[in-house]
Each structure stands twice: as structure tokens, then as C-alpha cells.
């Protein structure tokens, strides 16, 4: 069986999609809990860019320190139900995955910083600094809720136009982009911290 080491945290984030992909493609995952929530892996000392997820493939020793690189490597290296079959299919899957990445980076990640109280300026939440300074937490939540609605509506309209609104993102076949979207949606619907988004909307964030 193919086998990788995967360093992440005990949260959904960008790492859960990798676990799901590995399960669907028959890849064994050795989970390493990274600092600041674990002691198996030190991202600041061991990861090339000081971030997680980080992955090492036992078959060839390759190490990757970017979620998109990890995802595309796994579905290409180890063929399975999520492997694109044509260049066109790969491009469309990559486009939808990039939408999820933007949504995660500019909506979910700043929300996470508010939820966990990370108000000090650092590389990941600099985009929040002005908002928090000018209006505090309440303004930050309102602005991020507005951005959530805008991004979700754009995706919904595009899917309606493409005819895929009741199927998967690329049609009748589940893609690795669907896996990332699933983890993003369930994060907003089910996790306790994102109750602030549900309360601000007064509903399920992806109800419509």
C-alpha cells in the first residue's frame, strides 16, 4: 500500500481534504500532529515554508509543503476515482479547487482568527488588521459575512449556468475540488466557532 506522512492539526482546515483523498485512493496516512497543537512535527523548523499541511511520500521521499501541490500530486501519482482523465478535466477541477482555496483564505481563515482571538498582526491575518482597528470584532464579522455571501452567490450562479447545480462541480463525477468544497461547507455548518457566521446570517450559510 502507498504510504505518506502528513503533518497537520486536529482540525478540518486544508488538511481534511487530503485525508479524504487518501482514503478514496487507498493511500495510508501517518498523521503527525504539528505545533502549536501537537509535538510530532515542528512546522517552524521542519517545513520548508513554516506552514502546514506538509507531506512526505514514503515511495520516493518527495516532500511537499503546499496543499494544492499535495492534492494534485496524490491524485496524479496514485490513480483513483478523483484522478482527472483529460487536460480539460484537470483544468476545470483546478479552477474549482482554486475557488475553494480563495474562499478558505479570505473568508474561513480570517473568521478562524477572530474565533480563536488571534488579533495580533502576523502573516496570516494582516488582511484583518485594518478592519479590526477601525471597527473591532463586530465589523470584522459583518464584512466577512458580506464576503461569504458574495463568493457563495457567484459560485451558485456559475453552477446554475453550467447545469451542475444538482450534481458535482464538474458534472456527474466527484472531483478533488468537491472534496475541498465539502470540507469548507461542513466547517461553516457544523463547527462551534462558526456559529458567529450562522448567527450573523440567521441561517445555514449554504442553505440557499
Model regions and ranges:
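GST-like fold's C-terminal all-alpha helical module
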Residues: 100-207
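GST-like domain detector, emphasizing the conserved glutathione-binding G-site
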Residues: 1-138
Amino acid at each position: 500500500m502507498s504510504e505518506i506522512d502528513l503533518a497537520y492539526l486536529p482540525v478540518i482546515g486544508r488538511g481534511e481534504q487530503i485525508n479524504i483523498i487518501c482514503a478514496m485512493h487507498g493511500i495510508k496516512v501517518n498523521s503527525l500532529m504539528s505545533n502549536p497543537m501537537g509535538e510530532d512535527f515542528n512546522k517552524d523548523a521542519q517545513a520548508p515554508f513554516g506552514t502546514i499541511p506538509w507531506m512526505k511520500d514514503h515511495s520516493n521521499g518527495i516532500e511537499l509543503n503546499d496543499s494544492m501541490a499535495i492534492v494534485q500530486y496524490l491524485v496524479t501519482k496514485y490513480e483513483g476515482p478523483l484522478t482527472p482523465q483529460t487536460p480539460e478535466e484537470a483544468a476545470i477541477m483546478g479552477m474549482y479547487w482554486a475557488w475553494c482555496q480563495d474562499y478558505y483564505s479570505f473568508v474561513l481563515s480570517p473568521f478562524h482568527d477572530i474565533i480563536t482571538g488571534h488579533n495580533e498582526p502576523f502573516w496570516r491575518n494582516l488582511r484583518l488588521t485594518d478592519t479590526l482597528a477601525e471597527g473591532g470584532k463586530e465589523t470584522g464579522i459583518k464584512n466577512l459575512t458580506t464576503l461569504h455571501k458574495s463568493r457563495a452567490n457567484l459560485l451558485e450562479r456559475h453552477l446554475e449556468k453550467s447545469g451542475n447545480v444538482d450534481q458535482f462541480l464538474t458534472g456527474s463525477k466527484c472531483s478533488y475540488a468537491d472534496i475541498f468544497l465539502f470540507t469548507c461547507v461542513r466547517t461553516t455548518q457544523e463547527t462551534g466557532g462558526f456559529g458567529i457566521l450562522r448567527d450573523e446570517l440567521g441561517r445555514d450559510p449554504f442553505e440557499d
